[in-house]
């Protein structure tokens, strides 16, 4: 412990991975400085609180929930949060073409809701799928090819094509398929058929999303603010509002970390640097090239003067003419996300920095999404006139065709820096779940603690081609 105390560790970014790395390191006796650009910890998993006329409204940066198949991690979060960690159940629907479909799909709802042509096309696809040409290398396949080879063209056109294009901002035939196996719950059309057919005992054996999950009383970010408070109490130096500006390297090591806080640039030397910053930013701070990009989000959040909008946690909005991709009601996760007797809505709007949507005045966006909400059947007269917004510049790593080679080039350029560890969703440029990011943070800390190089293991952690949510113990 005394030797560890002499080693100083910089953790860049206080999201799930950075916080867990700092916790593990501090428990092992290391001196840890944790840097966070925002005023609060949590990164993309933070919760924002807005004070409206009728009370406080809380909004996450998207649809977060705590699920994991790691009993050790679950026990840690249970102990950390105690009675503040609630049990919740997810209910989701797909809105498309003026119809509302259950998600995941089920036969009674499809028979009641889907046009006859859709049902006929899906059955035809199922019969022809065994004879259809499939991509020979799914690592190089496009998302469009992957979906059609597993679901058939009819379901692809109905449920995936428009939504995916709107979310990622590129045509699905230009998007890589290598992440789909962990994110799409119906693995192939045979699974669809097994799901659609009713079971005698009512059970379903095919893979699907976890419906039950844990969620903090006051928003997902409460997990990370609570952990941040514990870290500070244990002696971690937490610097919020601190933007990393440069990483100085010499002889294969980062010698100094430079940051700006309160408009003053400062620097310090560290023995080891764990970076959860977006991978392109880490490269930029070291003067290295990196041709990787992100898809951004704007969130338009509005109070609603009614106790409940619906019983849906979120609604996928697949119609291309609707600006947002998801409509969420935070109160469905915890009743404490809105004042008593009221609720709120959150719309996720994909965009790119500098484009028309990113630059649009909030009043313009509100007008557009209000019209969209009305078309979805929401009583917009109950919205009032308050609007709260948030932005996430690095919401989704853009996994277009060929991104793997560009990611490998960036990682190869960083690997000679022996005291740098990239970890977490942003630091590894991976589209992963929160618990995986937390595990990556612990792995980075373990590398510092025992000196075993785990960088390649971290970069590929939980990269198996299976739906990760299906194995949740939370």
Enumerate the predicted regions with their spans.
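Glycine-rich FAD pyrophosphate-binding loop
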Residues: 26-51
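C-terminal lid/capping helical subdomain adjacent to the catalytic/cofactor pocket in oxidative enzymes
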Residues: 401-474
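Dinucleotide-binding Rossmann-like beta1-alpha1 core, especially the glycine-rich loop
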Residues: 53-135
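A short alpha-helix-loop-beta-strand transition element characteristic
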Residues: 47, 58, 73-95, 154-158, ...
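Active-site/ligand-binding neighborhood in enzyme catalytic cores
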Residues: 115, 124-247, 269
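Mid-domain catalytic core of redox enzymes
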Residues: 28, 240-381, 408-411, 459-466, ...
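Extreme N-terminal leader/targeting segments of oxidoreductases
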Residues: 1-9, 27-28, 470-474
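N-terminal Rossmann-like FAD-binding beta1-loop-alpha1 element of flavoenzymes
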Residues: 7-34
